[in-house]
Amino acid sequence: MPEEVQTQDQPMETFAVQTFAFQAEIAQLMSLIYESLTDPSKLDSGK
């Protein structure tokens, strides 16, 4: 049984890192969407 716990720790840690990275990407995307809705000129500037 302890071996099973050790093998599960690594995937859960990896999953947590991937989840955090995904949440950061979503936050950045939401920020860009909000910015484009509040200031449409940002879409045309190519920034």
UniProtKB/Swiss-Prot annotation:
Cellular compartments per GO CC: cytoplasm
Gene Ontology molecular-function annotations: ATP binding
Keywords: ATP-binding, Chaperone, Cytoplasm, Nucleotide-binding, Stress response
Cell compartment(s), UniProt: Cytoplasm
Miscellaneous comment in the UniProt entry for this protein: This protein is found associated with eIF-2-alpha kinase.
Family recorded in the similarity comment: Belongs to the heat shock protein 90 family.
Subunit details: Homodimer.
Role, per record: Putative molecular chaperone that may promote the maturation, structural maintenance and proper regulation of specific target proteins.
Name the UniProt record assigns to this protein: Heat shock protein HSP 90
